[in-house]
C-alpha cells in the first residue's frame, strides 16, 4: 500500500513539473482565464490573461500567433475551458491543456491567485 501511495504522489509531482515546464520553443506557457470579466475581477491566476471562452476564437491571435505555443486554459469548473480548448484545437493550436478550475490551475501550476 505504501508503494502505491508513493507512486501516486510521485506521479502528481511529475504532472505538476510537466505543466509548469516551458514549451517546445523555450517560452513560458500562455495561461488563459476563459471566465467572465466579473469572475476575473473576483480572483485570477497571477500572469494569466483574460479571454472569455465565447470570444477566444476571435481574440487568440492577439496573444498567440504561434500555433505551437503551449497554452493552458481554466475557468470555474472546467466546462468552459474544455470548450475553449476545443476551439483552439480547431484553429490549429497544437499544445492546449485544460487545467479545470481556477483552484485546480493554481494548485497544478503552483501559482498564486490574485484577488
Question: Where on the chain are the PLM-derived regions?
Answer:
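Boundary of Sec targeting at the N-terminus
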Residues: 19-25
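Short, surface-exposed ligand- or partner-binding patches at beta-edge/loop junctions that are enriched
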Residues: 74
Amino acid at each position: 500500500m505504501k508503494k502505491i501511495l508513493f507512486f501516486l504522489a510521485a506521479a502528481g509531482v511529475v504532472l505538476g513539473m510537466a505543466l509548469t515546464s516551458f514549451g517546445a520553443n523555450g517560452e513560458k506557457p500562455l495561461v488563459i482565464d476563459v471566465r467572465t470579466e466579473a469572475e476575473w475581477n473576483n480572483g485570477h491566476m497571477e500572469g494569466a490573461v483574460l479571454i472569455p471562452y465565447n470570444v477566444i476564437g476571435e481574440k487568440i491571435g492577439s496573444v498567440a500567433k504561434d500555433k505551437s505555443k503551449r497554452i493552458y486554459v481554466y475557468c470555474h469548473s472546467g466546462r468552459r475551458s474544455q470548450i475553449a480548448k476545443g476551439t483552439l484545437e480547431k484553429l490549429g493550436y497544437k499544445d492546449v491543456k485544460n487545467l479545470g478550475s481556477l483552484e485546480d490551475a493554481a494548485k497544478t501550476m503552483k501559482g498564486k491567485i490574485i484577488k
